[in-house]
């Protein structure tokens, strides 16, 4: 299961946790993906979409 938005292509970001002692450990930030039923290419499909795309209206939810 990929953690990528099917509309905008947003995926995981990589970086470091930094402690007060300046110790660094790598970590991953995942996008806030939601599984919704949406109309894509004229058919209703269940797709993974980030909340930014849902809020901005890039995807139309199926009723």
Swiss-Prot record:
Could you give one GO CC term from the UniProt record? ribonucleoprotein complex
What are the entry keywords? Ribonucleoprotein, Ribosomal protein
Nucleus keyword on record? no
Q: Which domain of life is it from?
A: Bacteria
Question: Matching InterPro entries, A to Z?
Answer: Bacterial_rp_bL28, Ribosomal_bL28, Ribosomal_bL28/bL31-like_sf, Ribosomal_bL28_bact-type, Ribosomal_bL28_sf
SUPFAM superfamilies, alphabetized: L28p-like
Q: What name does the UniProt record give this protein?
A: Large ribosomal subunit protein bL28
């Amino acid at each position: 299961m990929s953690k990528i938005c099917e509309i905008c292509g947003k995926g995981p970001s990589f970086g470091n946790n930094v402690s007060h002692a300046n110790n660094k450990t790598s970590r991953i930030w995942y996008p806030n993906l939601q599984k919704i039923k949406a109309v894509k290419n004229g058919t209703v499909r269940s797709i993974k979409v980030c909340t930014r795309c849902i809020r901005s209206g890039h995807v139309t939810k199926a009723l």
